[in-house]
Swiss-Prot record:
InterPro entries: Ade_phspho_trans (IPR005764), PRibTrfase_dom (IPR000836), PRTase-like (IPR029057), UPRTase/APRTase (IPR050054). Pathway: Purine metabolism; AMP biosynthesis via salvage pathway; AMP from adenine: step 1/1. SUPFAM superfamilies: PRTase-like. It is found in: Cytoplasm. HAMAP family: Aden_phosphoribosyltr (MF_00004). It comes from Neisseria meningitidis serogroup B (strain ATCC BAA-335 / MC58). Belongs to the purine/pyrimidine phosphoribosyltransferase family. It comes from the Bacteria. Keywords: Cytoplasm, Glycosyltransferase, Purine salvage, Transferase. It is an enzyme of class 2 (transferase). This is Adenine phosphoribosyltransferase.
Length: 188
C-alpha cells in the first residue's frame, strides 16, 4: 500500500538521516541513510516518494549504482513493476560487461554493467543514495547511453550542492531529481 503524497514529509526523511563527523576521514560530515532503511515507516516513505514521481513516466527499467543505489533502486523497480539492473564496481559482474571510468579525489575508479542489461531504446531511471561530485552517477549515465538506453532521469535522496555534482550531471544532458539538497559534507 502506497502512502498518499499529501501525507508525505521530505523534512521527516531529512531528520532521519544520521550525520557522523570525521568519517570516513577527518573533515567530512558523513550523511548515513541506514536509519531510513532500518525503519519500515521511513523506508516506505522514501520509496513511495519516488514511486509517485515515476509511476506515470513509462519507465522500462531502474538501474541502481553500487551499493546503496541497489537498495533503493530494487525496491523502486518492484513498486513500479519493472526490472532492476545493478551497475557494479569493476570486476564484480560475472557476464560480459561494458565499463566506464570516473575520477576520484586521488586516482580513478570504474563501474560496469552487463552488456545485455539495457535494450536499445529502453527508458531508464538511474538511482543512487547521494550526489557529491557526481562522478559515479555520470559514469552510470554513460554506461546506459553506451547500451542505447534513454535516460528518463537520474535520482538520489540527497545532493551536496556545493560539490557541483548535480550541476555536472545536468550539464551532461541528464535530468536530475533529488529529494533533499544540502550545502555539503565538509565540516567547518
Amino acid at each position: 500500500m502506497l502512502v498518499h503524497p499529501e501525507a508525505m514529509s521530505v523534512g521527516a526523511l531529512a531528520d532521519k538521516i544520521r550525520k557522523i563527523e570525521n568519517w570516513p576521514q577527518k573533515g567530512i560530515l558523513f550523511h548515513d541513510i541506514t536509519p531510513v532503511l532500518q525503519s519500515a515507516e521511513y523506508f516506505r516513505l522514501l520509496v513511495d516518494l519516488l514511486v509517485y514521481r515515476y509511476m506515470d513516466q513509462k519507465i522500462d527499467i531502474v538501474a541502481g549504482l553500487d551499493a546503496r543505489g541497489f537498495i533503493i533502486g530494487a525496491a523502486l523497480a518492484y513498486q513500479l513493476n519493472v526490472g532492476f539492473v545493478p551497475i557494479r564496481k569493476k570486476g564484480k559482474l560475472p557476464f560480459e560487461t561494458v565499463s566506464q571510468s570516473y575520477a576520484l579525489e586521488y586516482g580513478e575508479a570504474a563501474v560496469e554493467i552487463h552488456t545485455d542489461a539495457v535494450k536499445l531504446g529502453s527508458r531508464v531511471l538511474l538511482v543512487d543514495d547521494l550526489i557529491a561530485t557526481g562522478g559515479t552517477m555520470l559514469a552510470g549515465l554513460e554506461l546506459i547511453r553506451k547500451l542505447g538506453g534513454e535516460i528518463v532521469e537520474a535520482a538520489a535522496i540527497l545532493e551536496f550542492t556545493d560539490l557541483q555534482g548535480g550541476k555536472n550531471i545536468r550539464a551532461s544532458g541528464a535530468p536530475l531529481f533529488t529529494l533533499l539538497q544540502n550545502e555539503g559534507c565538509m565540516k567547518g
